[in-house]
C-alpha cells in the first residue's frame, strides 16, 4: 500500500501542476460550458438527469470506483493531510468511514450482498492504517535513508526492497441485514498484533447510532456485521515486525527490552498485579503495561483468525476427483 502511495505521490508532484491548466484548456477548446448547458436544458434532459442521479448515487459500484476509493485514502493521509501527533493512548482508538448500500450491491434477498462487505473493508482499513500509521509508513517507505529496519544478514546496512502492505486474511460475521440505500458507518481500529501480523477489527454500525463516543442503548442491535483482518508488512521478502511501524508512528510507550525483542511474556503482570496476588490500581499514565494488556486482550480473538491458516491441510481432491464441474462460476 505504501509503495503504491509513494509512486502516486511522486507522479502527483510532477504531473499535478501541469494537469490543471491542461484540463482547463481542453474544456475551453471543447466548449464544455455549452455541452453542460445542453445536457441539462436540451431535449431529453429529464431522462439524462435521472440517469445522472442514478449513476451518482451508485457511483461506488462503478468500474474503477473501488480503486479510486482506496487510492484516495492513501493519497489523502500520506500526501495531503498533516501527520498526526497522537500519543500511545490513541493506539486502539477507532476511525469512522461512512457510506451507503448501492443498487448494484443488492442481492436477490433485497439486501446488501455479503460479498460486497469486503470491498468496503478495503477502504476502511486503508483509512485506518494510512491515518494512524502515516508517520511510520513514510519512514519505512524510505528505509534506505531512515534505516528503520536493518538487514538481518548484515545489520550494518538497512534492509532493501520495495515496501508493501499485504492483506493476509479476513473473517466477517454477519449479524443483521443492510437494506438498499441504507446508510451505515464502518468503525475500524487496531485489535492486536503478533510477530508477523497486524490485526484490525471493523464493525458495521447504523449511521448516527453512536453519539459522543458512548455505546448506544441496545448497541448490539445497531451492529450489522463485525470483521477481523490481518496485514503483514514487507520490505522485499523481509517481514517487518508490526511494532516497528507502530513505534515509528509514536504510538508505543517505552518498554523494558523493547517491543520487538520481547516476544514471550511481559516480565511482570500487564495488569500490575501486586505481590499479594491482588491487582494493583491501574496507572493514570498510559504505559507499556496498559498497551500490552490491550494487545493481549485483542489477541485472544485474533488468534482464531490466525488458526485458519491451518485449513490448507483440509483440502481434499476426492477419491475420484470432484463430483461435478459446473459453471458459470
Model-found features: residue ranges?
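Hydrophobic beta-strand-centered segment that forms part of the acyl-chain substrate-binding groove
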Residues: 26, 126-184, 190-192
Amino acid at each position: 500500500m505504501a509503495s503504491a502511495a509513494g509512486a502516486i505521490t511522486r507522479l502527483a508532484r510532477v504531473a499535478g501542476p501541469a494537469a490543471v491548466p491542461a484540463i482547463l484548456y481542453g474544456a475551453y477548446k471543447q466548449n464544455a460550458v455549452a455541452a453542460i448547458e445542453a445536457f441539462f436544458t436540451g431535449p431529453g434532459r429529464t431522462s439524462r438527469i435521472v440517469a445522472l442521479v442514478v449513476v451518482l448515487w451508485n457511483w461506488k459500484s462503478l468500474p474503477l470506483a473501488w480503486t479510486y476509493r482506496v487510492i484516495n485514502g492513501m493519497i489523502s493521509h500520506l500526501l495531503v493531510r498533516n501527520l498526526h501527533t497522537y500519543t500511545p493512548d490513541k493506539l486502539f482508538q477507532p476511525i469512522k468511514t461512512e457510506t451507503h448500500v448501492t443498487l448494484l450491491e443488492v442481492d436477490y434477498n433485497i439486501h446488501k450482498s455479503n460479498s460486497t462487505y469486503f470491498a468496503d473493508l478495503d477502504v476502511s482499513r486503508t483509512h485506518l492504517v494510512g491515518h494512524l500509521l502515516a508517520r511510520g509508513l513514510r519512514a519505512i517507505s524510505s528505509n534506505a535513508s531512515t534505516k528503520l529496519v536493518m538487514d538481518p544478514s548484515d545489520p550494518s546496512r538497512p534492509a532493501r526492497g520495495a515496501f508493501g502492505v499485504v492483506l493476509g486474511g479476513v473473517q466477517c460475521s454477519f449479524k443483521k441485514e443492510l437494506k438498499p440505500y441504507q446508510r451505515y458507518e464502518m468503525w475500524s481500529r487496531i485489535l492486536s498484533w503478533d510477530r508477523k501480523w497486524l490485526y484490525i477489527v471493523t464493525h458495521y454500525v447504523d449511521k448516527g447510532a453512536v453519539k459522543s463516543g458512548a455505546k448506544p442503548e441496545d448497541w448490539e442491535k445497531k451492529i450489522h456485521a463485525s470483521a477481523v483482518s490481518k496485514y503483514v508488512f514487507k520490505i522485499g521478502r523481509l517481514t517487518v515486525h508490526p511494532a516497528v511501524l507502530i513505534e515509528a508512528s509514536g504510538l508505543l510507550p517505552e518498554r523494558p527490552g523493547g517491543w520487538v525483542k520481547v516476544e514471550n511474556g511481559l516480565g511482570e503482570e500487564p495488569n500490575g498485579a501486586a505481590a499479594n496476588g491482588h491487582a494493583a490500581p491501574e496507572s493514570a499514565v498510559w504505559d507499556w503495561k496498559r498497551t500490552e494488556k490491550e494487545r493481549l486482550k485483542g489477541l485472544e480473538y485474533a488468534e482464531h483468525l490466525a488458526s485458519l491458516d491451518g485449513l490448507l491441510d483440509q483440502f481434499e481432491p476426492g477419491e475420484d476427483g470432484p463430483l461435478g464441474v459446473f459453471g458459470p462460476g
